[in-house]
């Protein structure tokens, strides 16, 4: 059984064969129209028009990249030519100096003579020597560096009001004003007869209580209240009656003989 792709291909071949039979040889010259444009072709076609702002920018960038590529190529070719010329000159100089004495390595220009004493101006331009005006720092002392102070801080430092506004301080507690001695008219509950007779009328008696010893059973009952509770657990009992006692004899029972009759 053919697959789906094979069946589709076979149907296309059959359709093309039928059209060839109908139209004959004119099929090859038939105008099928314009090919369907893919997104890439559409974008390139839009970039080729100068009416679009994006297309103009694209052309400018393309020209700039081409210019950079050509300039870079010229620079590389020029550098290669200079390198080849230098190599040829070196070979010529080497061939001329084969019989002569070898020269030492050439020193770059503006190099100070090592035999002369070093000049601070040559070593570090602008350096005139060690600072002699400032005394050396003493041992175990810290030099306070000068810090930058903005004009705003200088203006605030001269005005105490601005300084207090910038660095607020906590409010100090104000002194309490002395209260005036007012007479109180609040009513107080007074006992009958006045406060003088209240001590005689009101009497309090301490209640009597009895101290229990540790060995007292009442104290033990209070200490362990579960000890005096009634137990409802059932104890196992035998198959005996509670009212009638059962007498068990150990004497052996005698076999009662049955008298035989005369007929037997």
From Swiss-Prot:
<dbReference type="GO" id="GO:0000122">
    <property type="term" value="P:negative regulation of transcription by RNA polymerase II"/>
</dbReference>
<dbReference type="GO" id="GO:0007519">
    <property type="term" value="P:skeletal muscle tissue development"/>
</dbReference>
<dbReference type="Pfam" id="PF05556">
    <property type="entry name" value="Calsarcin"/>
</dbReference>
<dbReference type="GO" id="GO:0043503">
    <property type="term" value="P:skeletal muscle fiber adaptation"/>
</dbReference>
<keyword id="KW-0963">Cytoplasm</keyword>
<dbReference type="GO" id="GO:0015629">
    <property type="term" value="C:actin cytoskeleton"/>
</dbReference>
<feature type="compositionally biased region" description="Pro residues">
    <location>
        <begin position="106"/>
        <end position="120"/>
    </location>
</feature>
<dbReference type="InterPro" id="IPR008438">
    <property type="entry name" value="MYOZ"/>
</dbReference>
<feature type="region of interest" description="Disordered">
    <location>
        <begin position="90"/>
        <end position="135"/>
    </location>
</feature>
<feature type="modified residue" description="Phosphothreonine">
    <location>
        <position position="111"/>
    </location>
</feature>
<dbReference type="GO" id="GO:0045214">
    <property type="term" value="P:sarcomere organization"/>
</dbReference>
<comment type="function">
    <text>Myozenins may serve as intracellular binding proteins involved in linking Z line proteins such as alpha-actinin, gamma-filamin, TCAP/telethonin, LDB3/ZASP and localizing calcineurin signaling to the sarcomere. Plays an important role in the modulation of calcineurin signaling. May play a role in myofibrillogenesis.</text>
</comment>
<dbReference type="GO" id="GO:0030018">
    <property type="term" value="C:Z disc"/>
</dbReference>
<comment type="similarity">
    <text>Belongs to the myozenin family.</text>
</comment>
<comment type="subunit">
    <text>Interacts via its C-terminus with spectrin repeats 3 and 4 of ACTN2. Interacts with ACTN1, LDB3, MYOT and PPP3CA.</text>
</comment>
<dbReference type="GO" id="GO:0031433">
    <property type="term" value="F:telethonin binding"/>
</dbReference>
<keyword id="KW-0597">Phosphoprotein</keyword>
<keyword id="KW-0488">Methylation</keyword>
<feature type="modified residue" description="Phosphoserine">
    <location>
        <position position="101"/>
    </location>
</feature>
<protein>
    <recommendedName>
        <fullName>Myozenin-2</fullName>
    </recommendedName>
</protein>
<feature type="modified residue" description="Phosphoserine">
    <location>
        <position position="116"/>
    </location>
</feature>
<dbReference type="GO" id="GO:0003779">
    <property type="term" value="F:actin binding"/>
</dbReference>
<feature type="modified residue" description="Phosphothreonine">
    <location>
        <position position="107"/>
    </location>
</feature>
<dbReference type="GO" id="GO:0070885">
    <property type="term" value="P:negative regulation of calcineurin-NFAT signaling cascade"/>
</dbReference>
<feature type="modified residue" description="Omega-N-methylarginine">
    <location>
        <position position="53"/>
    </location>
</feature>
